[in-house]
Design a protein with these regions (language model features):
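Acidic/His-rich structured neighborhood in mature extracellular/periplasmic domains
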Residues: 73-234
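Bacterial N-terminal signal peptides that target proteins for export
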Residues: 3-16
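C-terminal amphipathic alpha-helical segment
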Residues: 230-248
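Short, conserved catalytic or interaction motifs in soluble domains
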Residues: 29
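Post-signal peptide N-terminal segment of mature Sec-exported envelope proteins
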Residues: 32-62
Length: 248
């Protein structure tokens, strides 16, 4: 039986102090892990069932239509693409800000090899995420003082890899219907298969599921496939960038 969001919230509340105690026992990054826990908790508390938001008189017509479309794409993802059939993307959260998190990326000066950071669930990734833009900029400034090249980028969506029921976020609501569907496919693919410490494989797998899922989703609605020439050009550009990185 699928756990309710209320149960997951209680579990999260109980586990956070224990998890933080373990994580911080030999680590000085108390504030960083604290803001991660607080930010995720606030996001979970903001969730509402899609049906409730769709039926609410306070919901704008544009948002209502977008969520109705998302409902259909979400059902297709599990029924036809065999992606996880759970509560993710069947709830909505209004965050009141343009991005859900801001990621800080860093490389040694004149290098294309990213500095990685390791976490218990996600494994090692090439960024650190912050729920407040000011905190991200502050962390970036400290990294620059260490001689690193740094970039701060806003993120409109992310996946908890099935640990919680991920919502459709207000940060995603401005997207076109097609992009919203592809992101649902992409993020659910991460829940289906995720290999720790292998960002390249994880993104390649999720991107493949996204592209194939989009093709099938469009075909099911009687729409033509997305321009294959454009897709090939994007793939060629990606290979060129990766080859350039190897040479450098």
């Amino acid at each position: 039986m699928r756990c309710s969001r209320r149960v997951l919230d209680r579990v999260f509340t109980g586990l956070v102090p224990v998890a933080l105690g373990v994580l911080l026992s030999g680590c000085s990054s108390v504030s960083y892990y604290g803001q991660l826990a607080e930010g995720q908790w606030q996001l979970l508390r903001a969730r509402q069932p899609l049906d409730r938001v769709i039926e609410s008189p306070a919901t704008s017509p544009v948002l209502r239509q977008r969520l109705l479309f998302a409902e259909k794409a979400r059902a297709f993802a599990s029924a036809q693409l065999k992606l996880p059939d759970n509560g993710s993307y069947r709830v909505y959260a209004d965050l009141g800000r343009p991005y859900v998190v801001w990621n800080v990326f860093a490389t040694p000066e004149l290098s294309l090899q990213p500095v990685t950071h390791c976490f218990p669930i996600a494994g090692c990734v090439a960024y650190r995420g912050y729920y407040r833009q000011g905190a991200a900029r502050g962390a970036a400034a400290l990294m620059r003082q260490e001689g690193l090249d740094v970039y701060v980028g806003g993120v409109e969506a992310y996946s908890t890899l099935g640990w919680f029921d991920d919502p459709i976020l207000s940060t995603m609501a401005g997207w076109g219907d097609e992009r919203l569907a592809t992101v649902i496919f992409h993020e659910l693919a991460h829940q289906r298969v995720y290999v720790q410490d292998d960002t390249e494989f994880n993104e390649s797998f999720a991107s493949f599921v996204e592209q194939e899922g989009t093709r099938q989703w469009r075909a099911a609605r009687g729409l033509a496939a997305i321009d294959e020439v454009g897709a090939r050009q994007r793939e060629q550009f990606t290979r060129l960038v990766l080859a350039s990185r190897e040479r450098l």
